[in-house]
Amino acid sequence: TPNEQGVFTEDNTARFSSAVWYENIRSKTIILAGVGGIGSWTALLLGKLQPLSMFIYDNDAVEQVNMAGQLNSTNNIGKSKVDALSNTIKKYAAYNSVFAVNGRYDMSCEASDIMICGFDNMRARAMFFDKWKHHVALKPDDERSHCLFIDGRLAAEELQVFCITGDNEFAIRNYESNYL
């Protein structure tokens, strides 16, 4: 539909279609591993941005205990988290380029420029970060700034979010040394 200026926009992304970063995100593949308390909500919001594609990884099934902080409904209990979340994203974000991988993300999995970590254990975080770091190392120097690693950590009363670009060697070393 045309907006006030007569420019056609997609209704479901019109709110942020004029943002300077918007066209960039639409050309990106995003990998999000761990779709619990942080990952499930993040995936929904990313779906609303309509990236080129989004791969979500998790090997857990939805349980009653997940109702407290995760994006789930009681209708999803017993289903795989990624299948339930994928269906939710398709329904509430009108986004169909989300790919559910019902399994653990491991070193044999593909990496992408944008990787978001929603794991709840340090070993998985370290492996996921190593995979991203290796991917970035293969990029030409001028493309590394377009690579992004995000690690969200959630405790009962504390939230930490680490955002690292591929060209920030200090942040990469600091994260490895002090936060993994």
PLM feature spans:
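Conserved beta-strand segments of alpha/beta enzyme cores
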Residues: 53, 97-99, 148
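Glycine-rich phosphate-binding loop and adjoining beta1-alpha1-beta2 segment
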Residues: 53-94
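Short His-Asn-centered micro-motif
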Residues: 33-34, 57, 101-103, 117-120, ...
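A structured beta-alpha segment of the ubiquitous adenosine-cofactor-binding alpha/beta core
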Residues: 80-112, 119-123
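N-terminal charged helix/coil linker that caps or initiates catalytic domains
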Residues: 1-31
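Flexible, charged surface loops at secondary-structure boundaries
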Residues: 24-27, 48, 108-111, 142-144
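Glycine-rich adenosine-cofactor-binding loop
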Residues: 26-51, 55-63
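E1/E1-like adenylate-forming module used to activate ubiquitin-like modifiers
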Residues: 111-180
